[in-house]
């Protein structure tokens, strides 16, 4: 288990990658490298640049999903700093604060930490979400055949747990209690 400072360091590392919906190759290379570094058994990239990661051998896997792009521009002088417990990014060329791409880099970080901490897990990382869910709409459905449940961590804040989709309750109290340790 990583310490709080180590977790912050890995989050800063992920936030330091830059990606837009049209320029995300560096982030993809970083994610593939990290996946193997964290013990992934298989990493596959489809024709839509979605990344599929499998670790372990299970009849049924938990799955975590995120997306690889952000709405922010790419800056040559981009650097992430921690200030009073918050991560901020600055472009040294313009000397202005810029976005960190927390949407969905925090989701990518969660995926990597789940990969680090679980022996059997699947992860799907979708491309071009910010321009209309391009990658996820073309997802390889067979990747999910042996997935028991999936988490998506693309949320504002941390005070809620979405249990409904389009007015449909997705699971009950028993499931929520079972996944609480995660």
What are these regions (language model features)?
Residues 2, 16, 60-64, 76, ...:
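N-terminal catalytic or cofactor-binding beta/alpha core of small enzyme domains
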Residues 1-3, 131-132:
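Mixed-charge, polar/low-complexity N-terminal
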Residues 1, 37, 177-182:
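Polar low-complexity intrinsically disordered regions
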Residues 96-100, 104-181:
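Acidic/histidine-rich catalytic neighborhood of metal-dependent amide-processing enzymes
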Residues 86-100:
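Short acidic, glycine/Ser/Thr-rich loop/turn "cap" segments at secondary-structure junctions
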Residues 4-90:
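Acidic/His- and Gly-rich active-site-bordering loop/insert found
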Residues 10, 59, 95-96, 146:
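Alpha-helical hydrophobic/aromatic positions enriched in membrane-embedded helices and signal peptides
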């Amino acid at each position: 288990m990583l310490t709080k400072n180590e977790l912050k360091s890995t989050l800063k590392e992920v936030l330091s990658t830059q990606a837009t919906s049209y320029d995300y190759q560096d982030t993809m290379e970083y994610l593939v490298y990290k996946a193997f570094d964290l013990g992934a058994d298989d990493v596959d990239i489809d024709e839509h640049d979605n990344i599929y990661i499998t670790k372990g051998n299970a009849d049924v896997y938990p799955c975590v999903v995120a997306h690889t792009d952000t709405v922010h521009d790419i800056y040559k002088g981009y650097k992430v700093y921690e200030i009073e417990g918050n991560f901020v990014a600055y472009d040294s060329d313009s000397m202005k604060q810029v976005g960190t791409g927390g949407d969905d880099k925090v989701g990518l970080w969660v995926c990597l930490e789940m990969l680090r901490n679980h022996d059997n897990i699947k992860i799907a990382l979708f491309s071009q979400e910010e321009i209309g869910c391009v990658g996820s709409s073309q997802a390889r459905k067979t990747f999910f055949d042996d997935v028991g449940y999936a988490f998506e961590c693309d949320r504002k804040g941390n005070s809620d747990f979405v249990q409904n989709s389009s007015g449909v309750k997705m699971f009950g109290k028993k499931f929520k209690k079972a996944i609480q340790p995660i």
